[in-house]
């Protein structure tokens, strides 16, 4: 560990002795999040809210008029500021940091996996849906930050409006993925490379 080492990069006052403290008795990996979606973590609460509303309300994509996503300000700056790269990402990395794109994929598919970038980056229907998204700094989400990367989503359709918020995104220790969800993510990631 030097002045530009790993600990110096991530901790204001690193104490290397803490790395081995309670070794073998405290399992810190049980205190870390496992992301269910292949996108920026700031998008996950909103993606979970969209998936929940889609599942519960049988929302038809054709009926969607507009979608508003509320995030903490820091998240909004990273994935929500409205510019062309957020509405029409040109590659997977742009897509990972685009709330409109990730939200549109989840609204269409019910979830999002790694292969959805290839499937949706040039899909006119997905991009048209992403164009209906507006991302804002939300006072409630901001009040939850930095303890939680909360998100709230409002979907207006031609027949009615829906709203759902998620305080703790799926994958956090307090809202960990089920074994089935973790297995599904694993299968999604390895399927292109492993035979049955």
Enumerate the predicted regions with their spans.
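Terminal-appendage/accessory-domain detector
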Residues: 1-196
């Amino acid at each position: 560990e030097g002045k530009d080492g790993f600990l110096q990069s991530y901790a204001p006052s690193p104490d290397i002795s803490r790395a081995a403290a309670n070794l073998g008795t405290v399992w810190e990996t049980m205190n870390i999040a496992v992301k269910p979606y292949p996108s920026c973590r700031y998008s996950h609460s909103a993606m979970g809210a969209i998936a929940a509303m889609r599942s519960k309300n049988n929302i038809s994509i054709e009926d969607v008029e507009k979608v508003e996503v509320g995030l903490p300000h820091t998240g909004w700056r990273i994935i929500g500021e409205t510019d062309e790269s957020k509405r029409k990402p040109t590659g997977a990395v742009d897509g990972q940091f685009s709330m409109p794109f990730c939200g549109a994929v989840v609204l269409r598919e019910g979830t999002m996996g790694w292969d959805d970038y290839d499937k949706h980056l040039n899909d006119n229907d997905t991009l048209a849906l992403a164009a209906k998204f507006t991302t804002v700094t939300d006072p409630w989400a901001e009040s939850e930050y930095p303890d939680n990367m909360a998100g709230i989503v409002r979907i207006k359709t031609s027949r009615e409006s829906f709203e759902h918020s998620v305080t703790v995104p799926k994958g956090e220790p307090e809202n960990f993925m089920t074994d089935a969800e973790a297995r599904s993510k694993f299968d999604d990631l390895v399927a292109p490379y492993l035979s049955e």
